[in-house]
């Protein structure tokens, strides 16, 4: 009963997630968007199957195909078969290719494994599927997967692949094997290198008309021996003896999902001789081959890796003004998972960069993680039929604007508050951008230091600030008064590095105001241009007004 309840909950959660991401389109808009993406994928299919080339990365193709299926389900269309092979394959498979059902996560895999035994895990090698038919000890036929029942005659091509044994003996002398033709790699680390479009490269080599030495760059991983020995260990031993050594090397017995997860993670990070996109868990006990049909395999499932890069829908384009006045563009995304990290926003860069990318809400972009786990845009993989871009704010801001609050200064003003509260400046732990916005919205700050006047009662009654944290926040605000003079000057945005400011030995506001351009220019890392910026900064009316206000608050170094 518990198992069925868990399955029911999983189904309901899955359905809820699908319903939640259905686009808010009119029927006409939905028809147009679905039709455009369908045509593009059909073109990619034709290129892949008929010409053996691919204009799109395998991962992008897979994810956009899934996106198309999602849209079709949302709007009542008939979902397409992913990667539909050509219909002219005429060679019957002795045993049908079943395909493999995908598990959405570890919990789903655990449910599937719970009622099964004698289970084994193998890498899900990323290439193209093939049937190898041996008769009287010789390779008699090689057939592409096709539609699972019929495929193309690949015998001539496969006979040129040195990694495929042309003769076998013993139980394999009259056998049918199913496996994956893959691109041989030396020390391929999936976590670091990704899929490298391996599937398309293999398909390209197999589709070309000319026989090339490049076929020797291919290998084969046998993952099924229909009607073979009952014991998996016997199967693996016979395959290894015949020359299919990789199958034995990369097939391990597993008892539960935790063990599968450990192997999956190991292979994700290990040096392997092929590209993978997950693992396959299979039972050693299989039905007789005459019962095998496409889409009917209940004895094996796949648990794929999260793609290194994910296709994400752009929900909105937002503009942010930094403390220096520079306008940056941020894309809000429909949430995607990257390496266990939920990504909902990605920085595009400057307005000019955004215009070069040509990104609008509704577009599909490829997102990955750069150094230190920071999301980045790799490509725009699909643009919507209807595209409306927001207008960026006027470029009226600079490093000397928005110390005082106003309607037009909202974003730069908040950026200044976030900066001064950071660890390297005044160290106001416990408050970030959301907290500053809540304080400013409630108490309408006059300038960037107005928070010094807030009382414990005001903080406690601020919407968005937890009452349990308001006392701590007031305490930190009070402690900030004792920060060194140089920290307060940094909070005011002086255009100097901390090292240069410390080297100046400035200890009071009056001393700083009387320092000359020549004085600043002598500091380490400070040239004539930076020295002029310091002069402009200290002579700015807003800066002078802030200095006077801090003096009235008896902040160290600002007292008359």
From Swiss-Prot:
Keyword NAD: yes
Top-level taxon of origin: Bacteria
Residues forming the catalytic site: 124
EC category name: ligase
GO biological process, one term: DNA replication
Gene3D superfamilies tied to this protein: DNA ligase/mRNA capping enzyme, Helix hairpin bin, Nucleic acid-binding proteins
The reaction(s) this protein catalyses: NAD(+) + (deoxyribonucleotide)n-3'-hydroxyl + 5'-phospho-(deoxyribonucleotide)m = (deoxyribonucleotide)n+m + AMP + beta-nicotinamide D-nucleotide
InterPro entries for this protein: DNA_ligase_AS, DNA_ligase_B, DNA_ligase_CS, DNAligase_adenylation, DNAligase_N, NA-bd_OB-fold, NAD_dep_DNA_ligaseB, NAD_DNA_ligase_OB
Annotated keywords: DNA damage, DNA repair, DNA replication, Ligase, NAD
E.C. no: 6.5.1.2
Gene Ontology molecular function, alphabetical: DNA ligase (NAD+) activity
Similarity annotation: Belongs to the NAD-dependent DNA ligase family. LigB subfamily.
Function text: Catalyzes the formation of phosphodiester linkages between 5'-phosphoryl and 3'-hydroxyl groups in double-stranded DNA using NAD as a coenzyme and as the energy source for the reaction.
Protein name: DNA ligase B
Organism from which the protein derives: Escherichia coli O139:H28 (strain E24377A / ETEC)
Gene: ligB
